[in-house]
Every structure is written in structure tokens, then in C-alpha cells.
Amino acid sequence: MRRDIFQAIADPTRRAIITLIALQAMTPNAIADNFHTTRQSVSKHLRILTECQLVKQEQQGREIYYSLEIEKMKEIDKWLNQFRKIWETRFNQLDNVLSTMKKQKK
């Protein structure tokens, strides 16, 4: 089943996993060591992140390493950027209003 990226990142544990593996690939056990939860729970989160292609797995010897799929993160950033631009415009407008009010007080 293909999952929605935004449903995947809605969970705080999965966001924390993304933050962890953004710096370096990690095994499920190494990831689980950073949480107060079971290895099975971390595996479930990794499966969801893998299904929505935010995370990729690579076999190295007997270990599986999970790493961040940068292109999928770029898709999220691109989608969020449209809202970033809207809010930047609104904050700039607010700055202008506040500057005008400040000048009128003097």
C-alpha cells in the first residue's frame, strides 16, 4: 500500500527518525536506541516511511541501513514553499503597517 507523505510525517516519532537518519544511514537497532519504545514499533515506523519513499533501505552485509530519500524531501519542501511565500508577504505587509504606525506616533 502506498502511503501519503504528509500522513507519514504527521507522526512525531517518524519526524524524529527522519531527523536522525538525515545525517547518516542507521540500522533499525541504532535508530531504536534513540527512543523509549520497542524495536518492533521503530520497524513499523520505518516500514511506513519506506512505503511512502521518504526512506530507503540498503543491505550492507547482514545489516540493513536506512537513509533519507532526499528527492522526496525536496517534494515536501516544494509544496511547503508556496505557503512560505504567502506568509513572507503577509509578514512584510505587517512590518509596513507597524512602521507606519510608529512614524505616526512621533
Model-predicted regions and their roles:
Residues R15-I17:
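Pre-recognition alpha-helix immediately N-terminal to the DNA-recognition helix
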Residues M1, A8, T19-N34, R39, ...:
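C-terminal regulatory/oligomerization modules of transcriptional regulators
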